[in-house]
């Protein structure tokens, strides 16, 4: 797409600002953004926001490595972690609050949002499984290994399944801001 997708514009804000505004707007604390690649520009785009950053010095590595780096920065007192992807900019604060509330009713569970039956993001992981990810398992392996602890919740938010992996997807999402 010519530049990091986190820096693409959606209306007056960048993709990364849309993501973080939803997370912050949902009332979450201890937010960690993992930077890699062209991060001077991304760091500038999030300057002033109440977030911590971690640097992935090998931005070509698997996504799991970025997740591990972020998880290592989370406060030890946190009971759960919401893993948000920076290419899902349309997830609403209300959806994030719904996911967190579902965890309150299913403590220890992995909470995955669905839109019309299709799994989406972000996913909430309990502290009890975070160490598995930090020690080397990827998120998919953790979800599979704890399938009995997964709670899938239907949400009325297409943003959980809309990502920006291709220029066509970006144009489709961008069209919502015109």
Predicted regions and their residues:
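N-terminal glycine-rich phosphate-binding loop and ensuing alpha1 helix
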Residues: 1-35, 43, 99
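Short, structured coil segments at secondary-structure junctions
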Residues: 27, 47-50, 146
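Residues at the starts of beta-strands that form the adenosine-phosphate
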Residues: 29-31, 80, 149
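Short beta->alpha linker loops
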Residues: 37-38, 58, 62, 94, ...
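Acidic helix N-cap motif at the loop->helix transition within catalytic regions
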Residues: 40-46
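Conserved donor nucleotide-binding strand/loop of the catalytic core
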Residues: 48-61
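Conserved beta-loop-beta/alpha segment of the NTase-like Rossmann-fold superfamily
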Residues: 60-132
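Conserved alpha/beta core of the MobA/IspD/sugar-nucleotide pyrophosphorylase nucleotidyltransferase superfamily
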Residues: 131, 135-178
């Amino acid at each position: 797409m010519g530049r990091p997708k986190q820096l693409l514009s959606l209306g007056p804000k960048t993709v990364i600002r849309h993501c973080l505004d939803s997370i912050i707007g949902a009332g979450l604390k201890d937010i960690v953004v993992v930077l890699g690649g062209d991060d001077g520009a991304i760091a500038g785009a999030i300057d002033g926001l109440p977030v911590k950053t971690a640097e992935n010095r090998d931005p070509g590595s698997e996504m799991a490595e970025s997740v591990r780096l972020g998880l290592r920065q989370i406060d030890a007192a946190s009971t759960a972690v919401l893993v948000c992807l920076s290419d899902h900019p349309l997830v609403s604060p209300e959806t994030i609050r719904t996911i967190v509330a579902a965890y309150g009713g299913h403590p220890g569970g992995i909470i995955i949002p669905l839109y019309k039956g299709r799994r989406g993001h972000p996913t909430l992981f309990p502290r009890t499984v975070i160490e598995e990810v930090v020690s080397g398992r990827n998120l998919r392996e953790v979800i599979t290994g704890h399938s009995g602890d997964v709670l899938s919740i239907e949400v009325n938010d297409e943003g959980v399944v809309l990502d920006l992996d291709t220029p066509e997807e970006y144009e489709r999402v961008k069209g919502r801001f015109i």
